[in-house]
Amino acid sequence: IAGTHTNMKDCCLLAGCCTRRDIRFVAKRELLKPPFGFLFRMSGIIPVDRKIHDATVMPAVNKILSEGGMVGIFPEGTINRTDDIIMPFKKGAVRMSLENNCKILPFAINGKYKRGKLKIKFGDAYFPETNDIEKETKLLEQKVIKLIKECE
């Protein structure tokens, strides 16, 4: 699954109420530090060092997906604290899909976790149509923007 990142609670929300399958999220390595590191470790996050090209992420993702697991990623790479509808997407979600021949399930979370204001919208799962990672990443961005607008 791939979509917007509006708050630290996104992973819990998606994992807890949107599927019966476990979702292993790609998340910044810093989350493994105290005080909550043990919780993130227990949740099985796939840690990524965002300061470097972390070569350990794709093998971990490939293993999970090859075993029928589900991986969650926030293609913006961080929580969007800007006024922009989304930040430019990184290519990881499309790479994961292409390398593992698996569908991408786009989603949008709209709202800032104020009482009664949160909405989640899922799109249709799809396979990228081409091997053009740049083009397919832009297409994923467009799908997520459409979902955000449908949440308004």
Please report, for each region that a protein language model flagged, where it lies by residue:
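Catalytic core of membrane glycerolipid acyltransferases/transacylases, capturing the structured
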Residues: A2-I52
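Helix-adjacent hinge/juxtasegments
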Residues: F38-L39, S43-G72
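Short acidic-hydrophobic sequence patches enriched in Asp/Glu that either
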Residues: P35, H53, P88-G92
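Short hydrophobic segments within beta-strands
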Residues: I1-A2, V26, F74, F107
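Non-catalytic C-terminal accessory region of glycerolipid acyltransferases
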Residues: M58-E152
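Short alpha-helix boundary/capping motifs
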Residues: E30, D54-A55, I86-M87
